Swiss-Prot record:
One of its GO terms (molecular function) is phosphatidylinositol-4,5-bisphosphate 5-phosphatase activity. Residues 268-280 have a biased composition (Pro residues). Residues 1-193, 205-281, 294-334, 355-425 are annotated as: Disordered. It is an enzyme of class 3 (hydrolase). GO terms for cellular component: actin cortical patch; cell division site; cell tip; cytoplasm; cytosol; membrane. Pfam families: Exo_endo_phos2. The keyword Hydrolase applies. Residues 1-10, 72-101, 114-135, 151-161, 181-193, 316-334, 367-382, 400-413 have a biased composition (Polar residues). This is Probable inositol polyphosphate 5-phosphatase C9G1.10c. The keyword Kinase does not apply. It comes from Schizosaccharomyces pombe (strain 972 / ATCC 24843).
Amino acid sequence: MASRQGFSNVNEDEPELPPSVLSLKSKFESLSTGDLTNLDEKTAKRRTVKGCKNGTSEPNVFKARPIPPPRQVSSTIGSSTGRKVSGSIQRLASNFKNPSNPHADVSKIDRLPSDSSESHVATPSSPTISNSFVSVSPLLKRPQQKGPEISFQSSVQSTKGNDLMKHDDTNNHQIPPPKPNFSSKAGSSSPISVSPLKNVKAYISQSPTHSEASSVLSSEEEEENVINSSKSVPSFDLHDPFSQTFGKECPISTAPPVLNIGDRSLETPPPIPSPRPPQPVAVEAIQQSRAVISQQLPLHVSPRKPPKPPLRKVSTQRSSSPIENLATKSDASLVTGLQSSPYTHIAPASEMSLIPEKPRLPPRPSHTLSELSSPALTSENLSSKPSPLFPPPPPRVKSLATNKPVSMPVSTEQSDPSVAASSSSSSQLDVVLKGSIPDTSSVRRNPPCFVNGVESINVDFEARIFDVSGDRLVLAGNGGLRVYDTVTGLCHWHMPLGDTKVTSLSFKSSPENYSDDGRFVWFGTRDGMLWEVDVQNHHIVTKKSVSNCPITYVMVYKNEMWTLDDMGKLYVWQEDEIMGLSIQSTPHSIRTIPHATHAMVLDNRLLWVVVGKSIYVYDPSTSENESASVLAKPMTPPGLIGDISCGTTISNFTDLVFYGHVDGKISIFSKTQYRFLELITSSSFYRICSLVGVGNTLWAAYTTGMIYVFDVSESPWRLLKSWHGHKASHNGATTILGIDVNSVWKAKRLQVVSMASSVVKFWDGLMMGDWLATEMRSRFPEYSNFTDVSILICSWNAGASKPSDLDSDTIGASMIPMMIRDNGYPDIVVFGFQELVDLENKRLTARSILSKSSSKGGSSNSANISSQYRLWREKLESEMMRVSSNDDYQVLVCENLVGLFSCVFVKNKLQSKIRMLQSTTVKTGLGGLHGNKGAIVVRFLVDDTSYCIVNCHLAAGQSNKAARNNDLATILDNASLFPENDETDQLNTFVGGGDGSLIMDHEVCVLHGDLNYRINTLRPKALDLIKKNDIKTLLQSDQLLVERKRNAGFRLRTFTEPEITFAPTYKYDVHSEQYDSSEKKRVPAWCDRICYRGSPDYISAENYTRYELKASDHRPVSALIHSKAKMVNAQSQGSTWDVVKRKWIEYADEFKRKAKITYVMNYTSVSYQTAEQYLSGNNWNVQNALKQVSS
């Protein structure tokens, strides 16, 4: 068959042709003005079909369906050059009128004149070519291409339907006929479809040989019904367009094409279509020819509007091969893959079920909660293998001679929370899926700076990566590399790199010479170059192109260097006998997963690579013919968790691998068992940029510029420190952490380096200041004297009540004296009221806002509001005087904000011990502009113990929980208090490394007021539980308790609340014992709360109760706080300080010895005990110990 070609002008030297051919030639020349789309040399060119919009080749009627590419055939018929064509157009037309002519060979005519009503076709008169299609082309002559001829007659005899389209010139309609079924000689049945196009355009596909069958489904056929045909005679289509007379108006069939599948199925996979394009044919002629033939074939009846076809059911055979997976696709992409894919192992059509069936849902996971419970991170649990959630795949056993690891199943599937059968099971499931929350009660906020040496370095070029070794820091990035001294901060060398962009960097291992440790640096670039630089002598050693993509990681493993590029190619560089460890040597390579977001080599010589939140493990010791993957499938953490952004290991926990995530979580995996162990929800929900392990601590840097230090040796984790390490821009701060453990004996300090926005800072990895402060505070009883101080807290939302309302109420008249007597006449009495003025009076609150800006009217408005506070102060003073006959209580401080009022009384004997008294206010209403919501903060010291009392009123509303949380954060962070400048006084009186400028710096904090946290349940259920006095059940829905349990960032998590044993205090009808009966019918809630914070050894609470005062819609509450105030003895403190310093030196020396032992182990591959013996025998001199081991 001749190849389809583009139309062009005929050469002038072309021989004269018969009139019939010249007539066809003129028809084709009229088509040469249309646009042709040239695909390639072997792809057919397609003309723009008339009637399409915007010049596209897709008909309007089929606009919603994609048109498949032309069917490519494996062979072509020679061109018409040299063939004899005789007869006239009229004779050819008469041949088509005769239905008995079985030798009607046709050519394609792409366009017909609109004013012609006759069909101009051509048929060969020679019987020698009756079984071949003839393409008459006006193109230049080309060499004749011979190929197997396709018998049109034999193909027609084996069909059971048609796959043609008739074009009506009058109405310009398309009429899709039924499609034929072609059967091959091999006994296979395969459908061949022709996509219907407007203006009579068809795509013909045929087999390359008579012994092979071609089975290709178009994208349209994938969406249609597939009906199995039987051996019986098919039914007749009453609306068959071919039963109409040419030239008459034919009804348009709206039915989609129907594909008939024979009773025989393919037993062998269909062959891949040949890349050769199909030949052009005269479309209208072939339509008429097939219309005649269709009258001799059994006809098929199809409904005009069939129902929407169901989804195809495909074979569910599982396969790991991408070639076999093509057979499982049920969408239109299967057809494209069969037409264009070079794969040859495609599942045969007989494996594909064509019976419409409703798709089944996947089964639910069958694992239980006990399998998902988080184990404790102990050596006993880590030594035993866990039971997988699902049956593991067969392990991939490697050669026993090489002693390589075996593929391990991974038990990390997500669990279904519905498996929880009880509240305790649900709680355990929350821990597994949502993560446990660290203890933040002892967090310190001061940065761990060094006493001596430089603290930071500002870099004036775009530094992207760094590495540190001893006292040498190397920075690299876009266009340069610099070497700094970490102690002095001086720049020793700057090497310009021009347009070179460094993407990875690491110090080279120096196994052949200990003195070269920290001398040479390897770094990879974006263009795949690997450089070696001598940073001590300031020159380039060598460089080599090892990849055509960026080298993303350069890693060190003992005496080896590992490089990983972006396409997943890992190179392992080992020491050579001639060149040593050099870039110019030949590395061993393996293939890993490309585009790794994190990679690190562990001490068991395995590479852990992360893509997204999937973890892959590779063994580089495998041969090139063997798969390097250790796991049958990657590990992933369970639950809804973000992608992995960083990872690290901790030397004191040899079996644990820690990964940080973009949502602030930290996941833990077992290095030996290849399974997920635990999920930690840190106190920040921002992206973790970097992780570093130091001793028993894990350092985490966040995109906010904050750096957290966790103690992972305890369960739950303890947050030891949090400070603002770097400034964050509007895009965040990408903070990178780095550490050289050997710097503890090389540079005489363990330095953790952080870099963000071209600023490098150095932190004390041992945190000496925090260690000393914590040890000294734990020894307070050794050098301090303690006295008991009791504090009574009374909180009430007065609802704009007046002091006279207390006298009119039965309980109110005796409430304050009864409260003082029942709590044993405490040393300090604090009254905290809310809503002393009507906050719903918009006019009054507006005057209070403008009172400070208006000098004239503001004074009178302020006086009107202040009169309320003055009346309440006088009332409280009179009540306290009535309680104590000898004037025991005096007013310490009285402060007010719009609606808020705090009044503190102390006993006379305690007043002389109080110092550093200060009060301040924090506004949270209207974005901090209005004091209708906010807090009053009172701070004072009793001897050497600091107290802070906070009276607050938070945002109201059942659904405004987030606003209340934000108000708490604003109050605790923005209260402006005077700091303490003396470092000794800071250590003695404040906690967390603070100086007293924040609320959380104080040793005893009490927060009370109308916190407005509600109960998340329905009103009838709440009332029923209150009636039954089932307080514990109702407390399970309390918003404050739920936030403290589940929200890692909740600011009251470090506070303690006494046990609630009374009914909700809100909302009552005024002067009534009935809960809210208004239209809103609010759910009762414990809005009035008292919480405290402090060391359990020095603070406790009791008598947490409510009072039945009906003057407001709230009930007042009170609690008695017991605390111990200390008086530090300076002389005893000095003696204790000397003891603590000696203990610190022992701790630092022990850490230094362990670092040296680990260093010798890595260089010599000896055991821990052997390395310790060599070092102790050489007075812990590393260089002498290495020489002794090598000798």
